[in-house]
Amino acid sequence: TVGVNISHDSSICFKENDKLEFFEESRFNKKKYWEPTQENFDYVSFKKIKNFNDMFIFSSYGRENNKDEKIIKEICEKYNIKNFIFNPFMHHIYHACAAFHVSSFNTALCIVIDGGGARLPKKETFQETDSIYYIDNLKVEAKYKSYSNGRYSTFWSNFYNKKKLVKLTKLVKENLSKEDLFDDFFVKENCLYRMTHSYNPGLLFNHLCSTINLLSNNGFHHEPGKAMGLSSYGNNYGMRDEDLAKQVQEATEKYTIDLIEKALTYNRTRNIILSGGYALNCVNNYKYTQYFKNINFFIDPCPHDGGTSFGAAVWYDYYR
């Protein structure tokens, strides 16, 4: 089984019996955050793959206009890959499977938070930003999914305005603890779906990076890890870059505490796993362990999108 992540932090993982091997493409091509395009889709790390007749499971964050499918087609044609699966709605499930597999838990509630994953059918500006799963050694069950179009309704306009960022930060801090007139909810297959125009922690940190210019690759990629570190030097008031980072850090901490409390209503297990790009936030991760004294926490050691190739391989062998 071969998992291939075609998102940012591109990676491959192949599983044979109980042995897993994982490779980050940036270690091979020396290009940080590299992700494939239709014009530039070749992986140097593919030289590690021994058998292209294996089953390939592709993962991605959800590009627009069928770009994921087009990239996968190019890769499969070049390497004559005949057996493959790509399900655009599995991004957060792969995060959860990867994290659970390397934890010591037999049961857990996995919370995935990032800047956007699968797109909602027929409403493609809404991307999956928060998810809660119950997971054990036999099954993974979706309990809650939040889809946000904040990237389109808010993000692309006037993000250099620091006052706008401060207002958005206050909204995120209270986001899950009050009813929003602009939210919509529905239940499908025992999972509660939320459609919102609001930001989550991943989107807010991306907005912060654009506001204070923590960007790489000609502005194409945000550097939220640097913003999280910068927050340690700031105040929870003021307009300096480090002050804004501190305010975002505190707002997203409150948001995540609310989400953890929500997760604990779905099952009696006391085991919580955090994954998705926002789980790179080491400072806030520690704070959750102090807030929830009787909860066992496990933080995905590879919570960014690179880990989804690992999760895809695990999902295929254990949960399909």
Language model feature labels by segment:
Residues 1-320:
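Short acidic/glycine-rich loops and adjacent helix/strand connectors
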